[in-house]
Amino acid sequence: MARTRFLQGLDDLRARLLRMGGLAEQAVDRACQAYIDRDLTRCRMVLEGETQINITEREIDELAFDLLAMQQPMAVDLRFILAVTKINADLERVGDQAVNIAERVMDMVDLPKADLPVDIPRMAAAVSAMVRRALESFIEGKAELAQAVLEMDNVVDRMKDEAFIVLVKSMNEHPETTRQALDALLVARNLERVADHATNIAEDVIFWVRGADVRHNVAPEPPVQHEVTESH
């Protein structure tokens, strides 16, 4: 009976994290579109959604701690619970970055538009794809999907570095659009941080599935078990 309740708790934990992931992904998408369209309605939706993200984060942590206290989990279950708590924290921070972008848009909405030499929508699309792929790797329990996210992070890092170079140059050559260029640079930095959190999520999925710590560029160990295909 205790094992059955524990397994039900794992299912509930997984479902709650998927909901959290959906909220965070939605927040990023709305914030990015708000920046592209200067859409205050979407900005407000991001800010209002932060409360639910924070509530869900606390609920997940409480459930995870309850499950750890319920019984001594088997290795794969313990890794799952630990991964969920870490992914949960990263998703909350993804939501924070979405709020930062939304607040930036609200500050800049009255400024005249400037033709800046940077493709923020392209970077936003790449970052959104990273978040989506990281969540898919968790849903499917596939370490190879998570590994693809780690590779995508290099692309986003290059985009951010390129944005910094061209925007600083733009500020020097066109001081009248310095404020707009600075806003774009800050948004690019927010997007890079979202990508970093997506990378963390992918690393946690690899830890759960393979029992391998791939943080800090440590080469992954050979899988210690088959890819996880069950719900936990």
Place the predicted regions along the sequence by residue.
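Cytosolic, long alpha-helical scaffolding segments
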Residues: 1-232
